């Protein structure tokens, strides 16, 4: 399991990732924190992709809190060796089911949610909008249809 980087402006989250990695390691799961576990001699974009696409990596958690991480998510989402492992953690304001506004991030997350079902709103304590069953089914079915037509390789 790998826990990719968050925005550099959010340095306290490095400690959070380390804490989560320690907890996972205590449960017998191998967890990686890129800043601690990846070589600095090779570019992060090359090394992350090589490591995350390995068969022995089961899950990849990405917490999208900057455009850099959003770009990284976009690259991982289009890589079939990584996409099904991705678990995307987003602020409720950017989750496609909890924010009625359209925008780039919502449009980026919705195909992943439709194809793989793993985009989670996180940030304890906030109240978020919950879609009706009807609107959820219509939203997901339409995006799935769009993906099936335009990017059938994403649908497994």
Model-identified regions with their sequence ranges:
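Conserved catalytic or regulatory cores that recognize and/or transform ribose-phosphate-containing ligands
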Residues: 1-156
């Amino acid at each position: 399991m790998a826990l990719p980087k968050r925005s550099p402006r959010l340095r306290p989250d490095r400690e959070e990732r380390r804490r989560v990695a320690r907890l996972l390691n205590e449960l017998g799961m191998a967890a990686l924190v890129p800043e601690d576990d990846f070589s600095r001699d090779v570019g992060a974009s090359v090394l992350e992709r090589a490591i995350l696409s390995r068969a022995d990596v089961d899950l990849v958690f990405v917490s999208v809190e900057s455009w850099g991480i959003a770009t990284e998510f976009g690259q991982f989402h289009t890589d079939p060796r990584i996409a099904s492992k991705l678990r995307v953690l987003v602020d409720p304001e950017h989750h496609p089911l909890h924010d009625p506004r359209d925008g780039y991030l919502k449009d980026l997350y919705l195909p992943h949610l439709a194809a793989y079902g793993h985009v989670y709103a996180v940030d304890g304590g906030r109240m978020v909008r919950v879609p009706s069953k009807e609107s959820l089914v219509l939203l997901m079915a339409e995006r799935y249809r769009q993906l099936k037509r335009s990017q059938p390789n994403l649908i497994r």
